[in-house]
Design a protein with these regions (language model features):
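Extended catalytic-interface subdomain
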Residues: 1-19, 35-39
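Flexible loop/turn segments at secondary-structure boundaries
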Residues: 10-13, 61-65, 90-92, 183-184, ...
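Structured core elements
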Residues: 3, 53, 71, 82-83, ...
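Short loop segments at secondary-structure junctions
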Residues: 9, 75-76, 231
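Short, well-ordered strand-loop elements centered on a beta-strand within folded domains, enriched
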Residues: 2-6, 80-83, 192-199
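Solvent-exposed alpha-helices and their adjacent loops that cap or buttress functional pockets
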Residues: 1, 64, 74, 220, ...
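Glycine/proline-enriched, intrinsically flexible loops and inter-domain linkers
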Residues: 112-113, 118-270
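C-terminal catalytic lobe of FAD-dependent flavoproteins
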Residues: 21-22, 28-29, 35-159
Length: 270
């Protein structure tokens, strides 16, 4: 026998109005029409498939999150409610997910950084059209070639800063970080970003921008960065303990630091 499992480009969402708790591992009605383009290609590559025919079609739902990573850890806004779901390749990820979820529950942290899977990475903004479009797009591109720094269009412009339109008018090419549109570089030649595993057409433009800021001056839009006010008589000591660098003594001083976990791992940059 030959098993074929394509990720079709005209995917449809299921269960948008909720899923009955009685639904466990049941299957959905077969839909061969959506698979026809893929089946034709299989028959071209493996001619015997065209003569053998199809013995069985298995159709069932599969979960995809907006960024393709599963949801792990404490649920936002709830106490003692833990999540380990949303995995599109759960058989492969299951053992590791269970290990790090157990560490998180028992010790309050994991031995490796699991930020990319942290369920709290999605806020109230990640709902409706955003989640639907991004999840379908992730499914459709499951086994496509993914380039470094690649950002696709579905679900975009969900969160924009006050100067988004100004940056856009100057030729900014945007990426997405936690739903925010963040300028990556400025495409003055209107070429569009040409993704590559090597240096692409953004390299020289980014180099010029870095050189200009280093030797002259520049304005950075940090609106999408999280901001915290730490106050009190022990604020400095607390931050010096938390960060892998010393907090500036000078009022208004700025320093680049890495916030650490109790195990000495890097939680984030600040």
């Amino acid at each position: 026998g030959l098993v074929i499992g394509p990720y079709e480009m005209n995917a449809e969402a299921w269960g948008l109005d909720g899923i009955d708790w009685s639904f466990d591992n049941a299957l959905l009605p077969p839909d061969t029409e959506r698979l026809e383009p893929h089946l034709e290609k299989v028959a071209e590559r493996i001619p015997v498939f065209g003569d053998a025919g199809i013995k069985r079609v298995v159709s069932g739902p599969i979960t995809h999150t907006p960024d393709g990573n599963f949801l792990l850890g404490p649920a936002p806004g709830l106490k003692n409610f833990w999540m380990c779901c949303g995995a599109s390749i759960g058989i492969t990820q299951g053992a590791g997910a269970g290990k790090y979820l157990a560490q998180w529950m028992v010790y309050g942290q994991t031995e490796i950084n699991v930020r990319e899977m942290d369920a709290r990475r999605f806020g109230d903004w990640a709902a409706g059209r955003y989640t639907l479009e991004k999840a379908i797009d992730d499914y459709e591109h499951m086994y496509q070639v993914h380039y470094p720094g690649e950002f696709r269009e579905p679900g975009r412009t969900k969160r924009t800063t006050p100067i988004y339109e100004t940056l856009k008018s100057k030729g900014a090419v945007f990426g997405e970080v936690f739903g925010w549109e963040r300028a990556k570089w400025f495409d003055l030649n209107n070429e569009g970003e040409q993704y590559s595993f090597k240096r692409n057409n953004s390299f020289s433009a980014v180099a010029e921008e870095c050189l200009a800021i280093r030797e002259k001056a520049g304005l950075l839009d940090l609106s999408s960065f999280a901001k915290f006010d730490i106050e009190g008589p022990d604020a400095e000591a607390f931050l010096n303990r938390l960060c892998a660098n010393r907090i500036p003594k000078k009022t208004g001083g700025i320093s680049l630091v890495h916030l650490l976990t109790d195990l000495g791992g890097i939680e984030c940059e600040g």
